[in-house]
């Protein structure tokens, strides 16, 4: 897929000032400028994009999960007739991000530009999302259990991630 309707960055931990989220935001801006398409993200404040004009935001309350972000994308995409999504996600998050966006009915690809960054960039002790504070916590307390849940019961995964 060469052309897309929207760039969809997904955070990796909180706050927006984490090195991981700054790298994701920069990649989203580059992709938006290169493709001449808008950036969509949710919730508000998850990324610092300055006053970059072709951006669209949605908001929701509570825990920030990939499932909630994809649901916000679905709602906005219906209004704007978006079908093709370029995902910007941290390499450890790529598989599930792509799976969740495709499961919502989109044609999607993940931008490869972030794969060249060092693995240590993605994990930060100061992250408000405990699972992104270390490689071990991400894989063994979060990502692998999430993948098992997806395979065992997709609806269970979505229900849990929607809280």
Task: Give the label of every model feature segment.
Residues 125-163:
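Glycine-rich flexible loop motifs, especially short His-Gly-Gly/GGXG/HXGH segments used as catalytic or interaction
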């Amino acid at each position: 897929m060469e052309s897309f309707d929207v760039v969809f960055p997904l955070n990796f931990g909180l706050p927006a000032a984490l090195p991981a989220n700054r790298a994701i935001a920069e990649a989203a801006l580059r992709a938006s400028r290169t493709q001449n398409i808008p950036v969509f993200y949710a919730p508000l404040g998850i990324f610092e994009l300055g006053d970059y004009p072709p951006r669209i935001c949605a908001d929701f309350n509570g825990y920030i999960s990939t499932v909630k972000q994809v649901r916000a994308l679905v709602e906005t995409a219906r209004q704007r007739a978006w079908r093709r999504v370029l995902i910007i996600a941290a390499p450890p998050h790529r598989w599930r991000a792509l799976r969740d966006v495709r499961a919502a009915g989109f044609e999607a690809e993940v931008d490869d530009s972030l794969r060249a960054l060092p693995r240590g960039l993605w994990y930060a002790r100061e992250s408000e999302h405990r699972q992104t504070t270390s490689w071990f916590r991400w894989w063994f307390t979060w990502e692998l259990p999430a993948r098992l849940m997806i395979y065992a019961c997709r609806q269970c995964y979505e229900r849990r991630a929607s809280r």
